[in-house]
């Protein structure tokens, strides 16, 4: 491998190695290298061979390697390095020491409700800190959030001093309003809604009458007349099982199915058994007259 010397001396005037380089290469102080030595002088072409060859033509191995601090860098490496005393990059300024961490959070307090913990701190128009709830309320309503929550509205049935404008009662399960907007009790309101007239005062009662809601009997099963078992036959109406009269005998069982007639069997024609057609005939077939065959009864002849 060969390198081109960027700033080397002229090809005709080789420069002797210094004393330290001569000691490293095994030469005497101030002694110049020869062509057959460990390292040849600069060739006329200006190229330097960095492969040290010994006199015998084999690769020579140095016996002592100086530390990296004592070895001077080549001349072409100095051209690539920035000048000393200048920052590594023109746009980069002086390096500041890294801080150990973010500054501790200062103690904050909401100027409206005095809260010290909130998921998000906000500011009012004057720059004071507000908690998230007070800040949102001030942003939407334009005023500070009230510190005392307003009480819930009283139920209509528990309003004190409410009197029915028709019957003058103050006890009802539900307050209604008349077409004129006056409060009326539940009874007077329903009566006017159904009849379009005011409820007469003679119908007023001191107590509140509630309706007893009964469970509808539509879902219940109706028992058949006679008190028998609901499962009865649809034909004669006589109950089946033990729910009927024990003195009556049980119905007779249904007749058993009659076997198929033999003449109908012969009129069917060929019969399929196990995937084969077996025609009826007299020649050694299924009903044939041969050995092991079946003989038709007298008076009946198989039909083909």
From Swiss-Prot:
Stretch list, region Disordered: 77-100, 202-262
Acetylation recorded as keyword: yes
Record PTM text: Acetylated on Lys-158, Lys-214, Lys-218 and Lys-220 by EP300. Acetylation increases DNA binding and stimulates transcriptional activity.
Keyword Zinc attached: yes
Pro residues: compositionally biased ranges: 247-258
CDD domains in alphabetical order: ZnF_GATA
Biological processes annotated in GO: cell fate commitment; negative regulation of transcription by RNA polymerase II; positive regulation of transcription by RNA polymerase II
Location(s) in or outside the cell: Nucleus
Name this protein carries in UniProt: Erythroid transcription factor
Protein source organism: Gallus gallus
């Amino acid at each position: 491998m060969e390198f081109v010397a960027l700033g080397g001396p002229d090809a005709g005037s080789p420069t002797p190695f210094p004393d330290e380089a001569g000691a490293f290469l095994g030469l005497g102080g101030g002694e110049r290298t020869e062509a057959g030595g460990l390292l040849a002088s600069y060739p006329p072409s200006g190229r330097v061979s960095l492969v040290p060859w010994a006199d015998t033509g084999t690769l020579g191995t140095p016996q002592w390697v100086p530390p990296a601090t004592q070895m001077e860098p080549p001349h072409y490496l100095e051209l690539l390095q920035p000048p000393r005393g200048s920052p590594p990059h023109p746009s980069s300024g002086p390096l500041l020491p890294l801080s150990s961490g973010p500054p501790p959070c200062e103690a904050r307090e909401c100027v409206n409700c005095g809260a010290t913990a909130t998921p998000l701190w906000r500011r009012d128009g004057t720059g004071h800190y507000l908690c998230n709830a007070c800040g949102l309320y001030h942003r939407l309503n334009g005023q500070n959030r009230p510190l005392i929550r307003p009480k819930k509205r009283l139920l209509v049935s528990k309003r004190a001093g409410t009197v029915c404008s028709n019957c003058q009662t103050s006890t009802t399960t539900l307050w209604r309003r008349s077409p004129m907007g006056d409060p009326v009790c539940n009874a007077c309101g329903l009566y006017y809604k159904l009849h379009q007239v005011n409820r007469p005062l003679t119908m007023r009662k001191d107590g509140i009458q509630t309706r007893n809601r009964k469970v509808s009997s539509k879902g219940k099963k109706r028992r058949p007349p006679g008190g028998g078992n609901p499962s009865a036959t649809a034909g004669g109406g006589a109950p089946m099982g033990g729910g009927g009269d024990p003195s009556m005998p049980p119905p007779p069982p249904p007749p058993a199915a009659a076997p198929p007639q033999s003449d109908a069997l012969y009129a069917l024609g060929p019969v399929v058994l196990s995937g084969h057609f077996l025609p009826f005939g007299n020649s050694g077939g299924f009903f044939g007259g041969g050995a092991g065959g079946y003989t038709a009864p007298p008076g009946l002849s198989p039909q083909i």
